[in-house]
Curated annotation (Swiss-Prot):
This is Integration host factor subunit alpha. The keyword Transcription regulation applies. NCBIfam families: himA, PRK00285.1. Pfam families: Bac_DNA_binding (PF00216). The lineage of its organism: Bacteria, Pseudomonadati, Pseudomonadota, Alphaproteobacteria, Sphingomonadales. Gene3D superfamilies: IHF-like DNA-binding proteins. Belongs to the bacterial histone-like protein family. HAMAP family: IHF_alpha. Coiled coil: none annotated. It comes from Zymomonas mobilis subsp. mobilis (strain ATCC 31821 / ZM4 / CP4).
Length: 100
């Protein structure tokens, strides 16, 4: 990631809720933590998460495969695993393109 690109943090989102919605800082932080907790719990249970107009968090199972050590060239088995991917919605993609 490039150093000159800013990052939106939990604290930033909490501050936005405080200023724009009028919630207290404590309530804003609690709301963010609860929302992220619900998303995390759903993903832990193996559920995909779809937020309309934003995107989807999708769990994918990767099968075992053979990889190669780039330094030695020796083949190495890569264990099966579950990965989390994010796919932005079409609306989000359009908003990003228009904003660029």
């Amino acid at each position: 990631m490039q150093a000159d690109i800013p990052t939106l943090t939990r604290a930033d989102i909490t501050d936005m809720l405080y200023h724009e919605v009028g919630l207290s800082r404590a309530d804003s932080a609690k709301m963010i933590e609860q929302m992220l907790g619900h998303i995390t719990d759903a993903l832990k249970k193996g559920e995909n998460v779809k937020i309309s107009g934003f995107g989807s968090f999708i769990l994918r199972d990767k099968n075992e495969r053979v990889g190669r050590n780039p330094k030695t060239g020796i083949e190495v088995p890569i264990a099966p695993r579950r990965v989390l991917t994010f796919r932005a919605s079409q609306l989000m993609r359009q908003r990003i393109i228009k904003g660029a």
